[in-house]
Amino acid sequence: MTGMLPLLAAVVSAAVAGALTVALLVLLPLLMAQPDDRYPETNTFVLRRMDTVMPLLTLLGIGLSAGAVPAAPVVSAAVLHALAVLGLLVLLTVSAIVLRRVNASIAAAPGPAELRVLRHRWRGWHLTRVGGALAAAVANTAAVLLS
């Protein structure tokens, strides 16, 4: 079973990267095109679901990676992946906190300028999250291929 842990960690990492990439391709254009009065509500709807599921999947990936480290012949590759996924978890958590606070402050009194700022902040954070998830998935794939 321990031989399967690196592969399971790779699958979870790919799922995280895939979900964030889908959000980049589908949700980001939707949020950018929302009318001003609908944006805070839609953004809150998306954030509650994405920012609840993604850290849980990322924690699962960390757990699988940690379990795979003793089993991996190339320990450095597994450690690299575990660190990449841990960094992604921190990034997901920080971005969720920042975006929820900004969204809550704007939802109280939304104006076009504030909503533009929120949209661009969300876009920037999301692009960073997608990049981190893809880097973690690549590191995990390398760990599996090298083991």
Protein language model features and the residues they cover:
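Juxtamembrane boundary at the C-terminal end of a transmembrane helix
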Residues: 141-147
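Transmembrane helix-loop-helix
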Residues: 66-89
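Core segments of transmembrane alpha-helices
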Residues: 55-68, 85, 129-138
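Mid-bilayer segments of alpha-helical transmembrane spans in multi-pass integral membrane proteins
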Residues: 89-100
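Membrane-proximal soluble regions of multi-pass membrane proteins
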Residues: 120-124, 129
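Hydrophobic/aromatic residues within the transmembrane alpha-helices of Major Facilitator Superfamily
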Residues: 18, 93, 135-138
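A cytosolic-side transmembrane-helix exit/cap motif
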Residues: 98-110
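Interfacial loop at the N-terminal end of multi-pass membrane proteins
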Residues: 2-7, 12-60, 107-120
